[in-house]
Regions:
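Binding-site signature for planar aromatic cofactors or substrates
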Residues: 1-205
């Protein structure tokens, strides 16, 4: 395990903080400092109204006291599933530092102002394809889609956010921190919402 990870290690499990989000930010910062290849890559699982699951990778845009922020098209599979069933679960796995965090809870879209701000913070070069693409719809003509995106990007200026491009917040009901141990007594610490606060428990590996 790297130096940055070690500095945030054992004491956290022996004496947990009162809430998990500050610890999650610290672990994410440590992953970045230790050159984890994609520290913000979240494996996000959703399910439809019948409970049939699907999973994909999304990018965590921010860790707030209220949850994890990411963006997606409302017409994508995850967008449709979240509209039917708000519960989701995501895993941040950092192989390089032998850690993972699992965050589970209700997930829904934020307001237009926040979505606009996130959209405008993205590189302008990402705008044309995000505007042209109807995410998860069948691709019938790849060249036509590429040409549409090229034309949209000809001006090299920011494009308006598509109505379907939304900011989502995963509001945790539970957060579990896991850290590998050579003796297989891997360290696990789970936080669960308890009224207005949090309860924490050490778990067996």
């Amino acid at each position: 395990m790297s130096t940055s990870a070690q500095q945030l290690g054992g004491n956290v499990f022996a004496t947990p903080p009162d809430e998990p989000m500050g610890l999650l930010r610290s672990w994410l910062d440590a992953a970045r400092a230790d050159a984890v290849r994609e520290p913000g890559a979240l494996a996000l699982a959703t399910a439809d109204a019948d409970g049939r699951p699907s999973t994909r990778m999304v990018q965590v845009l921010a860790v707030r006291d209220t949850g994890l922020l990411f963006a997606s098209h409302s017409g994508s599979r995850k967008g449709r599933e979240l509209a039917a069933n708000r519960w989701a679960s995501g895993v941040l796995y950092w192989r390089e530092v032998a850690r993972q965090v699992v965050v589970s809870g209700p997930t829904g879209p934020l307001g237009a102002d926040e979505a606009d701000a996130l959209w405008m913070a993205r590189p302008v070069a990402t705008h044309p394809m995000s505007v042209a693409s109807q995410q998860s719809a069948p691709l019938t003509d790849e060249n036509a889609l590429r040409e549409q995106a090229r034309q949209l990007g000809d001006g090299g200026v920011p494009l308006p956010r598509p109505d379907a491009w939304l900011a989502y917040l995963l509001e945790p009901e539970s957060v579990e921190f896991w850290e590998s141990s050579p003796d297989r007594l891997h360290r696990r610490l789970r936080f669960d919402r308890d009224g207005t606060g949090w309860r924490s428990d050490r778990l067996q590996p």
